Each structure stands twice: as structure tokens, then as C-alpha cells.
């Protein structure tokens, strides 16, 4: 138990990002890391625009650049190439992320998605209403400025002023910004686009149908999607719609899916073949097998997201944040109702809209907050959502002419500073007054191992403990049996291995029945023998199959089938599922080393290192 306690203390200091699934962890790390570059680009733009070289700043972004092919050419100034060209790539990546969330992420579960969706809608409606109520006259047209949230700045600010452990809050806020981005791009298309060209819109429709067909047909190579998106972007620019529409719609049409068992096993076979015969053709086959196993959506995200976060968004800030505040411009902005309409709508509107919509949704029973996230965290995240920046600057450039655009930009910059300070104050108050500190999944095994109730392999007093939450129909759990066997051979009597049931009934229809069968076999002292058989025959888990395995093991088949249907057997499985929820195990296999949830790879070498570390 002392080793478990020390392991828990060390685990509490680990990087929280390691607790996330790989795609979400990659997304968060890239966005949070780019926040520093974004801040630097903003500062550089302001310094440049207010220096003796301010003329060169204006000249740079007004310089013309063209792409010509035969008689066709597309000409824009550099500012528009950034706003209409590179930012379309940014919104394409956002569209990819939205599609992934709806297909395999947080938005697949209506109960889990309900509160973030309500929060996002509140965070859109309340700021817009506040802005319209405050803004003078024709400036009310710019209400779209206050609806967006800058994901990079939001996550960067959360890392600085938010809870130390905030995994679940980050995912919640990321889901909110996904809805935010969908609405923001829709608003740009509906309210801030130029006169429209019906012929070009027809060409857009052709490319959209083409992209939908590519996804429908399961085309796994990225090149056809890239070419279709390029054609869609050109048609959108010619149509008069803002190019961000092309990016978002294109991303939404690229299918996302989890790797199938067949694809993963096929890739593994090809890599084994490459190890045995490392020539060029076999290596190419192995590489293609891996590409086929991972959805084109995630491959495009992995390739493009660093570019948009570390290059496109900072370049956008450099091109758009440079407001010349000299000659009374700053004073005029501070005296303008437009400026303060932006500030109040972003700082107070986002806080109230996201926070109150979440409270209403929870109390109405429409959904629940993610485990570990409480309302104080939601209000703090709502405050930080007032950092509108990227989308706000983009819409300000579309909605206003020069003087009003400068005032709106000043308001956006002031709001970013105030929203960060308000977020810190809300998080601090929630921690001090309500005890709402961490906002992440539980990390410690709950309840601890009890040999009287758990399925235990090894000495009860062994110095090392490895607990696995598994599903008998999960192919990844089946492969993990080889890992646990290797670990038991390596550590011998020093290792106690525990198996707990976590049947994922939504995706594995026979998993719960198989778990009950294993418990029924345990009543006759043959749990581990049936455990091994079930993983060897994952495709054959009907009642007749289970009875056959029981007979092969020499069990009393009648007693086995009777126990299979007993409430006590089902309760035993449900207790393990409840302990998985209490321990923060959301998928299979999930391992606990020394009572602490293991994050990252679960190959034999990685788990062996973690077990050795838990000794001291």
C-alpha cells in the first residue's frame, strides 16, 4: 500500500495532457503552444503599426499578388491572401475537428454533448444581444464580432490561470468552441459576404457533392480530398461568399472513424512481413496499410494542424492586429460606445451566456457536466471564452470600414486582457470558496484491490500490482493478454495482476454476457481458464459458445448456465463498471499501476518501466 501511495503522489505531478486520447492531446498541445506565438505576433503588429515604419506595415499587406494559369488568374492583396486564403485552411482544420467530434468524439453521445451545446448557444446569443443593446446605430451590424472564441488563446490562458489539473474542463471548452466555430462561419457566410455569383455557387455545389462521394465511397488517400477542397475554395472566392465557408464545409465532409479491427490487424501483418523481409515493396505495403487503418480525417489533421496553429493564425494576427493608435485614435476608441459594446459583450456576455446556459441545462436534466467539472469551472471557462481574437478580428474586418474597424479591434484587445483577468478571478474564487480545484478525471483506483472480491493472479502480498479494466470483445484487450503474460513472466512472484470488467456494450454487444460468463466460471474456481478462452474466441460469444467452453473446462454446465442468469452475477459485473467510472477508466484496456491510472502506450516495456517506478 505504501508503494501505491507514493505512485499516486508522483502521478499527481505528471503532465495532464497525457491523460487525453491521442488526437485530443495533440490538438490541445498544438493550440496551447501556439498561443505564445499568437501573442507575440499581436504585439509585433501593434508595435510595427505605431512605429516610424508604420507605412511599410500598410504597404506590405496592400501589395498585390496573383496566381495565373493560362488565361485564368486570381489576384488579391496580401492581406486578403491571408484572410481569404490561409484562413480558409484554418477553418478546414476546424471543420475536420468538428466532423471527428460528431463521428467518434464528445458529440457522439447526446447526453454528454447536451450541456456543451447549450453552453455554446448561450455563449453566442447573450454576447450578441448585449452588443446590439449597447452599440450605436449602424454599428449594430457588427454583432458577429462578439460571437467567436479564439481556441488557441483560450487554451493558453487556461494553462496559465486555470486549475492545475483541467483535462475534463479542456475537453468541455473544446467542444464549446467547436459549436462556436460552426456558427461563426455560418454567420460570416449569411451576413458578411459580398454580392453572390450563382454560377460559382453551382460549381461549389459540384465540389461539395464530389467530397461527399469520396467519403461515402471510403476513399482513403488524402490527395483527392485536397484537390477537391482546392477547387471548392476557388469557386467560393469567385462566388462572393467568404472563403472560410469553403474551409469549414470541406472539413465537415471528410469522414472520421475509429480504426477497425480488420484494418489494424492487416497493418500489423504487413509490418511483421516487413520485419521478416525489409525490402522497399514490403515497406511500402506496410506504410500503406497503416495509412488505411487511420481515417483520412485524422491524417489531414495531423499534417495540417501544426501549420495552421504555428504559422497561419500568428500570420493572421500580424496582418490584422496592427492598429495605429496615434493621433487620437486610442482616445477616440476609448470614448466610443462601439468599443465598449465589444468589451462588455465579450467579457460579460460570454461569462453569463456559457455559465447560465450550463446551469439551466443541468438543472433541467437535459444532460450532465463531464466528470470532474463543476459549475465554478464552467463560469471560469466562460470568462476565458471572452478572448475572441482570431474570429472576432476576421468578422470586424468584414463588418466595418476603417474607423469603426479600429475601434472594434481596440475593444477586442481590451476584452482579451480583461477576460483573462476575470477568468483567473473566477477560478480562484471557485477554489477558495467552493473547494472546486481540479477539473479532471479521477486518477486513483477506487476501490483498492480486495482479494476477496477481485479476480487476482499472483501472490496477494506481491510488491507490484497491475490492474486492467477489460472487455472480452475488445480486440485491443485481446492483444493486451500477450503483454500481461510477458509481464507476469518477467516479474514472477513480485507481480499481482488483477482483471476488472468494463464491457463496452454500445460497441460490443456480447461483452456483458461474456463478463457474466467469466464470473460464473469464477464460482467454480476457473475464472482465468475461461478468461483466456474468451479472448481466444472473441467472435464466438453466444450462449451456446459459452456453454461449450464451460464443458471443455470440465465445469458443471447446468450450474454455470444458472449462475450466468443470476442477479448476483450481473451485480458483480456492475460493481466493476461502477469502479471504472469512479477510477476514471473510460475505455479498454485501461491499466492501473500501483493504484494509479496509467497513461500513454501500454506495451510490455512501457508498463514494465511504470511497474519498476512504482517500487520506490
Swiss-Prot record:
What are the UniProt keywords, alphabetically? Antiport, Cell membrane, Ion transport, Membrane, Sodium, Sodium transport, Transmembrane, Transmembrane helix, Transport
Matching SUPFAM superfamilies, A to Z?
Thioredoxin-like
| Annotated GO biological process | regulation of pH
Keyword Cell membrane assigned:
yes
**Annotated spans, Na(+)/H(+) antiporter NhaA:** 1-434
Kindly list the GO molecular function terms attached to this UniProt entry: sodium:proton antiporter activity
Similarity comment text for this entry: In the N-terminal section; belongs to the NhaA Na(+)/H(+) (TC 2.A.33) antiporter family.
This chain's protein is named Na(+)/H(+) antiporter NhaA 2
Q: What is the lineage of its organism?
A: Bacteria, Bacillati, Actinomycetota, Actinomycetes, Propionibacteriales
Amino acid at each position: 500500500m505504501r508503494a501505491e501511495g507514493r505512485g499516486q503522489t508522483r502521478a499527481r505531478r505528471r503532465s495532464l495532457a497525457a491523460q487525453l486520447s491521442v488526437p485530443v492531446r495533440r490538438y490541445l498541445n498544438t493550440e496551447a503552444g501556439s498561443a505564445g506565438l499568437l501573442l507575440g505576433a499581436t504585439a509585433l503588429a501593434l508595435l510595427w503599426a505605431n512605429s516610424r515604419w508604420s507605412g511599410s506595415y500598410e504597404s506590405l499587406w496592400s501589395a498585390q499578388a496573383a496566381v495565373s494559369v493560362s488565361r485564368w488568374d486570381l489576384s488579391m492583396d496580401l492581406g486578403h491572401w491571408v484572410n481569404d486564403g490561409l484562413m480558409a485552411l484554418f477553418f478546414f482544420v476546424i471543420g475536420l475537428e468538428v466532423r471527428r467530434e460528431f463521428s467518434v468524439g464528445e458529440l457522439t453521445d447526446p447526453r454528454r454533448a447536451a450541456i456543451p451545446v447549450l453552453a455554446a448557444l448561450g455563449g453566442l446569443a447573450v454576447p450578441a444581444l448585449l452588443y446590439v443593446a449597447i452599440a450605436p446605430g449602424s454599428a449594430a451590424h457588427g454583432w458577429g464580432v462578439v460571437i467567436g472564441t479564439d481556441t488557441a488563446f483560450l487554451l493558453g490562458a487556461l494553462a496559465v490561470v486555470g486549475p492545475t489539473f483541467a483535462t475534463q474542463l479542456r475537453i468541455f471548452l473544446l467542444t464549446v468552441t467547436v459549436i462556436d466555430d460552426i456558427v461563426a462561419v455560418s454567420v460570416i457566410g449569411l451576413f458578411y459576404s459580398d454580392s453572390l455569383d450563382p454560377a460559382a455557387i453551382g460549381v461549389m455545389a459540384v465540389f461539395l457533392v464530389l467530397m461527399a462521394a469520396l467519403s461515402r465511397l471510403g476513399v482513403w488517400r488524402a490527395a483527392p480530398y485536397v484537390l477537391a477542397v482546392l477547387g471548392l475554395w476557388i469557386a467560393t472566392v469567385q462566388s462572393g461568399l467568404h472563403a472560410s465557408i469553403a474551409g469549414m464545409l470541406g472539413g465537415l465532409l471528410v469522414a472520421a472513424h475509429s480504426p477497425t479491427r480488420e484494418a489494424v490487424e492487416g497493418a500489423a501483418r504487413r509490418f511483421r512481413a516487413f520485419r521478416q523481409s525489409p525490402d522497399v515493396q514490403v515497406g511500402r505495403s506496410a506504410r500503406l496499410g497503416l495509412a488505411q487503418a487511420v481515417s483520412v480525417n485524422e491524417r489531414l489533421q495531423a499534417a495540417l494542424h501544426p501549420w495552421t496553429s504555428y504559422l497561419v493564425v500568428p500570420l493572421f494576427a500580424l496582418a490584422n492586429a496592427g492598429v495605429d493608435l496615434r493621433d487620437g485614435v486610442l482616445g477616440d476608441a476609448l470614448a466610443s460606445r462601439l468599443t465598449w459594446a465589444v468589451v462588455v459583450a465579450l467579457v460579460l456576455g460570454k461569462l453569463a451566456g456559457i455559465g447560465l446556459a450550463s446551469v439551466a441545462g443541468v438543472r433541467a436534466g437535459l444532460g450532465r457536466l463531464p466528470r470532474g467539472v463543476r459549475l465554478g469551472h464552467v463560469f471560469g471557462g466562460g470568462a476565458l471564452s471572452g478572448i475572441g481574437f482570431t474570429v472576432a478580428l476576421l468578422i470586424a474586418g468584414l463588418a466595418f470600414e476603417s474607423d469603426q474597424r479600429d475601434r472594434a479591434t481596440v475593444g477586442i484587445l481590451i476584452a482579451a486582457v480583461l477576460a483573462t483577468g476575470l477568468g483567473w478571478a473566477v477560478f480562484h474564487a471557485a477554489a477558495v470558496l467552493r473547494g472546486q480545484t481540479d477539473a479532471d478525471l479521477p486518477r486513483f483506483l477506487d476501490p483498492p484491490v480486495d482479494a476477496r472480491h477481485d479476480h487476482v493472479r499472483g501472490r496477494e502480498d506481491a510488491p507490484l500490482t497491475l490492474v486492467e479494466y477489460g472487455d472480452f470483445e475488445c480486440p485491443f484487450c485481446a492483444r493486451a493478454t500477450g503483454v500481461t503474460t510477458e509481464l507476469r513472466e518477467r516479474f514472477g512472484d513480485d507481480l499481482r495482476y488483477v482483471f476488472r470488467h468494463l464491457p463496452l456494450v454500445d460497441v460490443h454487444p456480447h461483452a456483458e454476457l461474456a463478463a457474466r460468463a467469466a464470473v460464473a466460471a469464477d464460482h467454480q474456481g476457473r475464472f482465468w481458464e475461461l478468461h483466456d478462452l474468451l479472448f481466444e474466441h472473441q467472435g464466438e460469444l453466444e450462449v451456446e459458445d459459452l456453454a461449450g467452453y464451460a464443458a471443455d473446462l470440465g465445469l458443471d454446465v447446468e450450474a454455470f448456465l444458472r449462475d450466468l442468469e443470476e442477479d448476483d452475477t450481473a451485480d458483480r459485473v456492475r460493481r466493476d463498471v461502477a469502479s471504472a467510472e469512479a477510477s476514471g477508466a473510460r475505455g479498454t484496456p485501461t491499466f492501473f499501476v500501483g493504484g494509479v491510472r496509467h497513461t500513454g502506450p501500454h506495451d510490455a516495456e512501457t508498463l514494465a518501466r511504470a511497474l519498476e517506478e512504482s517500487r520506490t
